């Protein structure tokens, strides 16, 4: 949780030999983060990212696109946000794995994406409607211009 990280903690991390931190910020769009039940916002992640950079700690960010409520606009906002952090590496995942008995599995059943009887032993990934065709090409385009971005 970002609010638990401050400059004093980062100083201790550096003293302990920390060289890299993975930031699972998932989205740069606050409504999408709220929909994923994340307890932080993009500005908190930006604050921590800057502190880490100030102390020479490399940062890898994880961007998760296509969840419930995701739109073209929120995807664009997240990509721009991720780019603005100037991270050493960004890992983009499109679609969210559906696990049994979760809020996402209930949404996927309601939307007809999976059946209520699906045991989900074979991985299934939720992708918001309307993004199926557009999202992979958009991510590919962004990654083509950013060699430190992977999927």
Residue ranges and their predicted role:
Residues 1-151:
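A structural motif corresponding to the C-terminal lobe/cap of the Radical SAM core domain
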């Amino acid at each position: 949780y970002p609010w638990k990280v401050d400059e004093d903690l980062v100083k201790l991390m550096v003293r302990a030999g920390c060289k890299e931190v993975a930031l699972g910020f998932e989205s740069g769009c606050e409504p999408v983060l709220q929909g994923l039940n994340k307890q932080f916002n993009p500005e908190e992640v930006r604050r921590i990212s800057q502190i880490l950079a100030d102390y020479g700690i490399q940062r890898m960010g994880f961007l998760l696109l296509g969840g419930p409520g995701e739109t073209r606009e929120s995807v664009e906002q997240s990509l721009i946000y991720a780019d603005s952090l100037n991270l050493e590496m960004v890992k983009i995942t499109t679609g969210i794995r559906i696990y049994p008995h979760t809020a996402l599995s209930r949404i996927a059943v309601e939307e007809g994406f999976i059946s209520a009887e699906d045991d989900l032993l074979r991985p299934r990934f939720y992708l918001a409607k309307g993004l199926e065709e557009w999202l992979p090409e958009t991510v590919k385009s962004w990654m083509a211009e950013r060699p430190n971005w992977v999927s």
